[in-house]
């Protein structure tokens, strides 16, 4: 799309014509950066700040955004509006300055809601699978020449970005329940993949409040909108009588409106049938492993079918889907000095996400020894789901445990990496290896990993950078000892 074509798209939100400069505090995150990219391409002057540059900020700078490293009150001067991420603390100098200057301050989801207000919004929520499902929906719509705008929480590999401004009325976006801010969204179609206990501090530790918030999210749909929900999830199944909107269910269950059948996985590819009520069956090849991804694809198929997208476009999009960054992302093989090992990186940081990732690895490569490098994410999550983590992590062959990635939290006694190691060790099936930092992992792996192993780096913190490093290194005990 040329700059002239992009400039014409600014008329998409004429009601925001008084807005000149939009400033993002914490612009380097995938969610914030994605919205900033769409707005920059619409022609708005975008500025932002973060503690360090990264791939997101570099891409935004290439689009003309001005990025500040560090936070300072003067950065918000002359801003029309300030957008803040949930990670920003109340004493941030830019946030304080914006309030003193009476500049409107909105959360990320509020700005996303404004982008969606004048479009046909498709919002994807759920504890797990949001990013992949959003990416699958966006890929199908792109394959069908619907040219959607999308904002995704991870890098869509085929597009090389996590956000794109399209020329059509469609906006496909990931909806974040972590701070309940997804209630700002008013889409035409909403998907809910599953509901489990996570981010419980937001909901006062009350799971019933979390469920009620998801129902409120679905009721933000107009009466003529569409809810697409996974009936396999017991919480969602129990909520069905309370959802007062047109609803399509999907899943493995016989009573699903869109049912996945005959799932078979071979390495990284999956094949299955999809039975659709009133629309016939599809034979699907999905370029992703794991039955959980077949369910994500079923949600995307349900939305696309309901919107009149042809079967050929659906089948093509799923077969050539290139995946999402840090979602079972394969880095090929790397040398260990004891042979070649397969390297995979995954963002999953909830016990259920870790479980399905392990299952996908076992199903696709059953002959390989599974070596996991796991980094817990947040002390509160580790505390709340402690036994679940210990159970699922006991299922790998070799476990290298990192310390908890705090994400701004204070340590909680008994909810750290060493404690998890002790609990796993007490189960008697595995002897975990504790490593304090990702920088120390290569030396440990040099003495552990051998020919034919599958090394899986797992977690939402900085363990993702470790996978990229390993892919570029030739590990050997000698090189690690010499500091090479």
UniProtKB/Swiss-Prot annotation:
The keyword Cell division applies. The lineage of its organism: Bacteria, Pseudomonadati, Pseudomonadota, Gammaproteobacteria, Aeromonadales. Pfam families: Mur_ligase, Mur_ligase_C, Mur_ligase_M. The gene is murC. Pathway: Cell wall biogenesis; peptidoglycan biosynthesis. GO terms for molecular function: ATP binding; UDP-N-acetylmuramate-L-alanine ligase activity. GO terms for biological process: cell division; cell wall organization; peptidoglycan biosynthetic process; regulation of cell shape. It comes from Aeromonas hydrophila subsp. hydrophila (strain ATCC 7966 / DSM 30187 / BCRC 13018 / CCUG 14551 / JCM 1027 / KCTC 2358 / NCIMB 9240 / NCTC 8049). It is found in: Cytoplasm. It is an enzyme of class 6 (ligase). This is UDP-N-acetylmuramate--L-alanine ligase. ATP binds at residues 126-132. Its EC number is 6.3.2.8. Its main location: cytoplasm.
């Amino acid at each position: 799309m040329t700059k002239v074509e992009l400039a014409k798209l600014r008329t998409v939100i004429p009601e925001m014509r008084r807005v000149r400069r939009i400033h993002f505090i914490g612009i380097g995150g995938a969610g914030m950066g994605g919205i900033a990219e769409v707005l920059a391409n619409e022609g708005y002057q975008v500025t932002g700040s973060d503690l360090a540059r990264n791939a997101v900020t570099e891409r935004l700078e290439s689009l003309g955004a001005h990025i500040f490293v560090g936070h300072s009150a003067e950065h918000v001067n002359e801003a029309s509006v300030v957008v803040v991420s949930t990670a920003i603390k109340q004493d941030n100098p830019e946030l304080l300055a914006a309030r003193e200057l009476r500049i409107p301050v909105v959360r990320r989801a509020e700005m996303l809601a404004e982008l969606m207000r004048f479009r046909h919004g498709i919002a994807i929520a759920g504890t797990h699978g949001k990013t992949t499902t959003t990416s699958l929906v966006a890929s199908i719509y792109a394959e069908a020449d619907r040219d959607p705008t999308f904002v995704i929480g991870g890098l869509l590999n085929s597009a090389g970005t996590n956000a794109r401004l399209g020329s059509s009325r469609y906006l496909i976006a990931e909806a974040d329940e972590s701070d309940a801010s997804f209630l700002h969204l008013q889409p035409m179609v909403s998907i809910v993949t599953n509901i489990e206990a996570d981010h419980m501090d937001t909901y006062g530790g009350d799971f019933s409040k979390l469920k009620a918030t998801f129902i409120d999210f679905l009721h933000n749909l107009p009466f003529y909108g569409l809810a697409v929900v996974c009936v396999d999830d017991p919480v969602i199944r129990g909520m069905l009588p309370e959802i007062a909107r047109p609803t399509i269910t999907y899943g493995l269950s016989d009573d699903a409106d869109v049912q996945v059948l005959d799932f078979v996985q071979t390495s990284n590819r999956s094949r299955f049938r999809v039975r659709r009520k009133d629309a016939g069956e599809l034979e699907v090849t999905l370029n992703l492993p794991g039955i959980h991804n077949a369910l994500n694809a079923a949600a995307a198929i349900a939305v696309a079918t309901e919107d009149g997208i042809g079967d050929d476009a659906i089948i093509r999009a799923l077969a050539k889907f290139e995946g999402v960054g840090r979602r079972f992302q394969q880095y090929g093989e790397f040398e260990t000095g004891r042979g070649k090992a397969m390297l995979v990186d995954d963002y999953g940081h909830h016990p259920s996400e870790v479980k399905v990732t392990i299952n996908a690895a076992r199903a696709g490569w059953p002959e390989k020894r599974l070596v996991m490098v796991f980094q817990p994410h947040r002390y509160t999550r580790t505390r709340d789901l402690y036994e679940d983590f210990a159970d699922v992590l006991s299922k790998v062959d070799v476990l290298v445990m990192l310390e908890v990635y705090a994400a701004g939290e204070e340590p909680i006694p008994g909810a750290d990496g060493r404690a998890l190691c002790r609990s796993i060790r007490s189960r008697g099936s595995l002897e975990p290896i504790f490593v304090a930092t990702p920088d120390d992992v290569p030396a440990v792996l040099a003495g552990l990993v051998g020919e034919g192993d599958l090394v899986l780096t797992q977690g939402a913190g900085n363990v993702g950078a470790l996978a990229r490093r390993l892919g570029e290194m030739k590990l050997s005990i000698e090189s690690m000892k010499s500091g090479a």
